């Protein structure tokens, strides 16, 4: 074939492929907006550009996963039109400070440690919730641990009110929908003498005046305990007492768009944590020598995120993402 004919054919092929590519992106963009109820004004061009960059990043990661370079996959979700900075500003609301001198839990030596634990199977865990665009992760982490301890005591699983914590725990140091600390949430319930149910005091993803009503209280805290910042201590305590509140680094895009598999990203910090979650179990895929051990983490970003709202996070890999750095639980 003549070289000029070959080049002409190549150019024609590229030109014809480009409209198909953009048509495909147009369809996916429209479908994504419809799925997540997104409506834009003047900023749609910018949001579309951000979404496309995130989509390309996700697809590149998944190609590398298929080549064995990663242990987890990613997927587009409701956060796709946000930059990383925007996402962190509206979703990761844990206010970090030096740990107060509180009681440190010493796990009993006589506890038999099973090879795997999943407190969901024992009835300790309420369905996955959605914090919305509110810096309220700390409240969801705290209610999750308290829900588990109340179930352990009473045999009844009752969903507790995050809104009660968001609206009422400022005296203990929290900042409502602008962020807070898990231990300060426990301190509020202890000081207040109770916490209302989710049914009586529903969540609406923004701050309001305190509307706590003692007659609707269904939980109390007698004390709370910090766990030494070691994964083995976290494992022993989790197996012994039930779901544990924890703080992690959730700032990376790989976490934001996590879909399934064991989450391990070398860039995830073990010290700079910014998001409250609930540890509900641990286990392993395959043999423990293959770096396939994981923590089972309940998030508060709805069931469309991750594995129906959960994530498997790498376990025993140098406190990956800070999973053991700020773990605690209440007693009731």
Swiss-Prot record:
Its EC number is 3.4.22.15. SUPFAM superfamilies: Cysteine proteinases (SSF54001). Residues 18-112, 288-290 form a propeptide. Glycans are attached at residue 220. Zn(2+) 3 binds at residues 183, 226. During export along the endocytic pathway, pro-CTSL undergoes several proteolytic cleavages to generate the CTSL single-chain and two-chain mature forms, composed of a heavy chain linked to a light chain by disulfide bonds. Autocleavage; produces the single-chain CTSL after cleavage of the propeptide. The cleavage can be intermolecular. GO terms for cellular component: apical plasma membrane; chromaffin granule; extracellular space; lysosome. This is Procathepsin L. It comes from Felis catus (Cat). The lineage of its organism: Eukaryota, Metazoa, Chordata, Craniata, Vertebrata. The gene is CTSL.
């Amino acid at each position: 074939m003549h070289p000029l004919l070959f080049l002409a054919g190549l150019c024609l092929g590229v030109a014809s492929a480009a409209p198909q590519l953009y048509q495909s992106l147009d369809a996916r963009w429209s479908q994504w907006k419809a799925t997540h109820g997104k409506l834009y004004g003047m900023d749609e061009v910018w949001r579309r550009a951000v979404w496309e960059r995130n989509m390309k990043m996700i697809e590149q990661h998944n190609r590398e996963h298929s080549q064995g370079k990663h242990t987890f996959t990613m997927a587009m979700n409701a956060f796709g039109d946000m930059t990383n900075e925007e996402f962190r500003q509206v979703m990761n609301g844990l206010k970090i400070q030096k740990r107060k001198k509180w009681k440190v839990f010493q796990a009993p030596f006589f506890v038999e440690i099973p090879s795997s634990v999943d407190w969901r199977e024992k009835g300790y865990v309420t369905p996955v919730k959605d914090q919305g665009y509110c810096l309220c992760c700390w409240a969801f982490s705290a209610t999750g641990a308290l829900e588990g301890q109340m179930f352990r005591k009473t045999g009844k699983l009752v969903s507790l009110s995050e809104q009660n914590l968001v609206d009422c725990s400022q005296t203990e140091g929290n900042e409502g929908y602008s962020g807070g600390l898990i231990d300060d949430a426990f301190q509020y319930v202890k000081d207040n003498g109770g916490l209302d149910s989710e049914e009586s005091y529903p969540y609406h993803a923004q701050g309001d005046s305190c509307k706590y009503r003692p007659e609707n209280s269904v939980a109390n805290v007698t004390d709370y305990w910090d766990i030494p910042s070691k994964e083995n201590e976290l494992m022993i305590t989790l197996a012994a007492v039930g779901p544990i509140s924890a703080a992690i680094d959730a700032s990376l895009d790989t976490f934001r768009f996590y879909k399934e598999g064991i989450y391990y990203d070398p860039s995830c910090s073990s010290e700079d944590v910014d998001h409250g979650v609930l540890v509900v179990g641990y286990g392993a895929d395959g043999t423990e020598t293959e770096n396939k051990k994981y923590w089972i983490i309940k998030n508060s970003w709805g069931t469309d995120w991750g594995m129906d709202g959960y994530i498997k996070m790498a376990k025993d890999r140098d406190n990956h993402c800070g999973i053991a750095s700020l773990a605690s639980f209440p007693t009731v």
